[in-house]
Amino acid sequence: MPRPLDRRDFLVMSSAAFAAQWGFAGPAAANTMTTPVIDRLSVKVLTDSSYDTPRASASKWVKVRRLGLSAAGDYRKTLHNEWGLALALESQAGTESRNLLLDFGYTTDALVNNLEIMSVDLAKVQGLILSHGHFDHYGGLIGLLQRYRSRLPGELTLYAGGEDNFCRRVIAGSAPGQFAEWGVLDRRELAGAKVRLVLCPDPTVIADQAFTTGVIERRSFERVFPNTFVDYSMKDGIGCDIPAAAEKAGGKPVPDQHLNEHATCYQLKDRGLVVISSCGHSGIVNATRQAMKVAGIDKVHAILGGFHLFPADEDYLRQTVVELRAINPDVLIPMHCSGPGLAAALRNQMPDQFVPSTNGTEYVFGV
């Protein structure tokens, strides 16, 4: 039986070598697809890790609409915020509009409450996207389907980055070798709700207007910060089917590298790319450069979502800002797991691009 791998084994191995040895597909070649072009994009923040009192944010590139302290017409209803992320995306190309839900937060109750307050019409949703296999991004999904499947279109597809989105996740316990459950997405429940599953390890166009990066190539200084561990086994029909990884892990949980994490992107007419990195375990610079590579476009208009920099020290944040300044996006909107350190650094060093985010905000690009 192979020996269990520790985190050092993962850090000394290149992402490409690790992916090959563990049975994962590598990043796609450059310019493998023609990316669609849109005229307008609305991003509604349905679930985020913080909520602040509404305050104005000025940017010539994006219209920012902040929700008040309570729902319109009923002061008793207010937003619920929690650790996690869920976004409603509405894009428009010409006269055609498309509506997608990207990630689903930690709990169904918060997601459903905020969907209602932010006036998201489930009947118009044309697709679902899951960024990666962490519970705080899919926790609200099954409950949403159980409660409101009849409101959603009959033909509904969930686009996930790859097979490892369905692996069982665990977290380290109080004693060495002990682990506690941290969720697993059961594809049987998706099938029971008549949701078609499409895995997207390669770049994929979604609903004619969005596209995903596919597997994110890891070429920058960035590293995956310690997070969950992965159990690659199948138990009672639940889990992920990656035989090479299961064999190599030897039945032991191994540090999570999120090799099937992907970002959701749009190409905005005359502006450039909008890159949405829901959690950014792969690195926000890596994710953005992968989007640029897939689309064959150097101009990035906006980067938003989770950057997963709350564990980062000052040197790491400083290097991240250097790389972001080199990419030179017009707008930067860190959310969820990005951390107060990054927000402070961007406010200080990229004040014209930085837009602070809070739960219940709508961002409109292309106006």
Describe the residue ranges of each PLM region:
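Active-site-proximal loop/helix segment associated with metal-binding centers of metalloenzymes
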Residues: 180, 205-266
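Active-site metal-binding motif and surrounding structural segment of the metallo-beta-lactamase
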Residues: 109-159, 294-304, 328
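Binuclear metal-ion centers of metallo-dependent hydrolases, dominated by the metallo-beta-lactamase
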Residues: 192-199, 322-367
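Active-site-proximal loop/helix segments of hydrolase catalytic cores
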Residues: 111, 247-298, 305-308
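N-terminal secretory signal peptides and thylakoid transit peptides that target proteins
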Residues: 1-18
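C-terminal segment of N-terminal export signals and the immediately downstream linker at the start
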Residues: 24-44
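Conserved beta-strand hairpin/beta-sheet module of binuclear metal-dependent hydrolase folds
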Residues: 50-52, 58-118, 257, 261-276
